[in-house]
Amino acid sequence: LGFSKGNNIGVQHAKGEYLCILNPDTVVPEDCFKELFEFSEIKNDLGLFACRLIDGTGTFLPESKRHIPTPKVAIKKMLGFIKSYYATEVEEDSTGIVPILVGAFMMVKTNVYKQVQGFDEDYFMYGEDIDLSYKVTKAGYDNMYYGPIKAIHFKGESTLKDSVYAKRFYGAMQIFYKKHFKSNRLTKTIISLGIKMAKLFKGHTSVEKMPVNRYVLISDKNYPKLAEIFKNSFQIQTKIEVFQANTQVILDANYLSFKQIIECMSASEKNQNITFKILPKNSNFILGSNSSKNRGEVIHF
């Protein structure tokens, strides 16, 4: 079906005042929607709105807030100057108007979504969130980024980080420029260069596996089968604290709220090789992702 068509079908069956577009590889805190709803009620002319996204290591995902990828911005992005692509003028933990939000998690009033005719089904995958954000802005609404709320987007599970991704992205930009910008030699050159550069990608980029010296389960319960997997390097504690370098932290959702889990991941030292796994409620497996560039891992016990 593709991302656009699949979501539009869902919207046809939705009956609420608000719509939430949410990827399956996400984790949201318990108070997420309550806080976003309260925020939406005090903002006039609200278009799309969304929260801060982090990856499976707790690292902020800059695509949470972006600028319109005009031909000039696209050229800079291809040359490695990404500051103009991301909306860095809005701090990641603050709130502000941004042109483009990410399709992994966005909310919008149903009437606004239908007014701009929803996701454009000419896009199969990639670019549809840019197109929707741009249409909503052109209709006179403000797209809002709400940084106080954080959610996890594992990302590597729904994104192809290789030549296929690059080709699809620049193909989507070709559609975007045809629909919203006057076609000229410059835009055609940008797309042509983007597609040519995509062919130079050598496929999936592996991320170096970092050493893990200890495994710490945050829980009030013992899981003997889980302990067997990690042997002598496994320990259990009930409090979240500052972890030593090269530690993998296993967060038990039977004991911790998702808000606590997300806060723990977000607050971790990013240069200490602290990684995370989540033990979902009533489950016999842990899962997580040590890089937004690679697929995650599921360990059964």
Feature roles, as predicted:
Residues L1, T26-V27, Y123:
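Acidic metal-phosphate-binding loop of nucleotide-sugar-dependent transferases
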Residues T26-E63:
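Conserved donor NDP-sugar-binding/catalytic core segment of glycosyltransferases
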